[in-house]
Amino acid sequence: TLFRSMNKELQAYVEQAILPRYEHFDRAHGPEHARTVIEQSLALARHYQVDRQMVYAIAAYHDVGLEKGREMHHIHSGEILAADTKLRQWFSPQQIAVMREAVEDHRASSDHEPRTIYGRIVAEADRCIDPPTIVRRTIQYGLANYPELDREDQYRRCVDHLTHKYA
């Protein structure tokens, strides 16, 4: 399985302290999304010579910066990861620096390529190329963040977002 060789203490920490933070975000960025990105990231990681513990942590932290707003969430997520002293039990300062960069680089709508393979893995996993899921999450995000829009404007916003992010 994907979690077979995962450090159990790290996994317990993420499950108890990090993933619950996603419960406060819109449905498109809730715990289900975080778990999907973790699973997809670990599945992709099997094809590369990478540290699976790092991939797991990067995926777990990738959207926690939404606590401070959407626009710079990728930067805030990196700051939150780097400031989490608990991670020093499992990772060196150099690994944490790479992880921070990967979290900062994960954003699919970013105008630059991720700096490392870790950023590329999580960015790709976060894209979630399943069309029905993409549309559902885009609609959920719109309803949660733009409640003033009527049905027609929600549809227009959805199409604009999908065109910008995936076209």
Task: Place the predicted regions along the sequence by residue.
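Short alpha-helical hairpin
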Residues: M6-P20
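Divalent metal-dependent phosphate-bond-processing catalytic cores, especially two-metal-ion Mg2+/Mn2+ enzymes
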Residues: K8, E23-V50, Y61, S110-A167
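An amphipathic alpha-helix signature
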Residues: Q11-E15, I38, M54, G78-A82, ...
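An active-site-proximal "capping" alpha-helix that borders the catalytic cofactor pocket
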Residues: V37-S41, M72-L87
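Hydrophobic, well-structured mid-protein blocks that either form specific transmembrane helices
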Residues: E79-R115
